[in-house]
Structure formats: C-alpha cells, structure tokens
Swiss-Prot record:
Molecular function GO terms recorded: G protein activity; GTP binding
Domain remarks in the Swiss-Prot or TrEMBL record: Switch 1, switch 2 and the interswitch regions are characteristic of Rab GTPases and mediate the interactions with Rab downstream effectors. The switch regions undergo conformational changes upon nucleotide binding which drive interaction with specific sets of effector proteins. Although most effectors only bind GTP-bound Rab, ATG16L1 effector binds both GTP- and GDP-bound RAB33B.
Protein name per the record: Ras-related protein Rab-33B
Keywords from the UniProt entry: Autophagy, Golgi apparatus, GTP-binding, Hydrolase, Lipoprotein, Magnesium, Membrane, Metal-binding, Methylation, Nucleotide-binding, Prenylation, Protein transport, Transport
Gene this chain is encoded by: Rab33b
Highest classification ranks of the organism: Eukaryota, Metazoa, Chordata, Craniata, Vertebrata
Residue positions binding Mg(2+): 47, 65, 88
Post-translational modification: Prenylated.
InterPro entries named among the record's database cross-references: P-loop_NTPase (IPR027417), Rab33A/B (IPR041822), Small_GTP-bd (IPR005225), Small_GTPase (IPR001806)
C-alpha cells in the first residue's frame, strides 16, 4: 500500500495467473489510482461519508479519527477500472501535526465537509482551506464543499444561501446531503463519482465570468448547489 501512496498517479496491477508469464494468461489489469482527502472539523461526518461511499451503508459505530483513516474502492468509469482512495483525516489538531505532510502528499482532489447543524464547523472552513494552500503544490486541484446532516432539518444552523456564497467565493461547487439517511445513499455516491469522473477525464470545472470580472468555477452541467434532502 505504501508504494500506491507515494506516486501522484500510480498504476496498479492484478492478475489471476499463479505464475507470471504463464501461457494463455491475459495482460494484468491496470487501474489508475486517485487520492482524495476529506477534511473538516471533528464530528462533521467525514468518516460516515467515506464509509457510506465505500461500504454502501452507515457505520454501526464511529469513534474520533486519530491521524488518518484510509478507505479504498474500485469503480468502473467508461470501461476503465479506477481506484478511489479516500483519506479521512482527523479534525483535532493534536492528532494532525505528525500526519499533515503525509496525507497532503500527491493529492488529486479535496472534499471539505461541514456539519449543517453546527455553525462553528462552517466557520472553521477558512482555516482548513488555508491549510490546503500551505501544503498543496498545485493550484488546480479539484475541490468541493459538502454540507452533511441535511436530514436534521429542525436543527440546521447553516442556511444554504450562506454556504453557497462561501462556495462561490472559493470557487467550489456545493453539495448538501446526509451520510446517515439511507435514502441519500445514491446521493453520497454521486458526490464522489462526480469527482472521480472529473479526475479521470482531466476536465476542469467550467469557468464562468461574474459581473465584477471575478472568475468562478462551476460544475459543467450541474447547478451551483445540489441538495438531496
């Protein structure tokens, strides 16, 4: 696994042949690997989102992530086998210091997560964005913003229009969803698969010109905010 993590875009091989080069064996399958880090405050649901995507269900129990929690899922996109590595990072600073350089290495995309029922987690987003700027070498790495726990309607503190304004300011598409609600399983899937499709095709998010001449990144065919609750 270490070798997979070290390169910016690795190719992994698998073969059903017991002996390399055996007669009649097909060439080994090749899979591109994309490393996506999921960051945000503790208890915003990062682990639950990654677990929902990789395991297809909500975890029976969760504990605070210490360091990095790593999950991987292989998917087929347009006939190509792709491996998606999700790095679920600790939200508490005391668990992060020794790991920061490691999990930011060779990142292909970033998912920022906040808890829609916790305004403090939303206010922490600028600090997470600044951390990314300090450790990521490339400026064109795709980034998306995810508001989690939208099923808790009566407890929501972060209105969609406020989150959308923040997303526009930082050139990110916004998604609102719930990792817990089983009805949103396909929606969590769509978030990560949309990102995987963009990484595979190497297509940038579509540029749109704002009235004050700022450039904003928008999804190519999707509205700026997608809410499935």
């Amino acid at each position: 696994m270490t070798s997979e993590m070290e390169s910016s875009l690795e190719v992994s091989f698998s073969s059903s042949c017991a002996v390399s080069g055996a007669s009649g064996c097909l060439p080994p399958a090749r899979s591109r690997i994309f490393k996506i880090i999921v960051i945000g405050d503790s208890n915003v649901g990062k682990t639950c989102l990654t677990y929902r995507f990789c395991a297809g269900r909500f975890p029976d129990r969760t504990e605070a992530t210490i360091g990095v929690d790593f999950r991987e899922r292989a998917v087929d996109i347009d006939g190509e086998r792709i491996k998606i590595q999700l790095w679920d990072t600790a939200g508490q600073e005391r668990f992060r210091k020794s790991m920061v350089q490691h999990y930011y290495r060779n990142v292909h995309a970033v998912v920022f997560v906040y808890d829609m029922t916790n305004m403090a987690s939303f206010h922490s987003l600028p600090a997470w964005i600044e951390e990314c700027k300090q450790h990521l070498l490339a400026n064109d790495i795709p980034r998306i913003l995810v508001g989690n726990k939208c099923d808790l309607r009566s407890a929501i503190q972060v209105p969609t229009d406020l989150a959308q304004k923040f997303a526009d300011t930082h050139s990110m598409p916004l998604f609102e969803t719930s990792a817990k609600n089983p009805n949103d399983n396909d929606h969590v899937e769509a978030i990560f698969m949309t990102l995987a499709h963009k990484l595979k095709s190497h297509k940038p998010l579509m540029l749109s010109q704002l009235p004050d001449n700022r450039i904003s990144l928008k999804p190519e065919t999707k509205p700026a905010v997608t809410c499935w609750c």
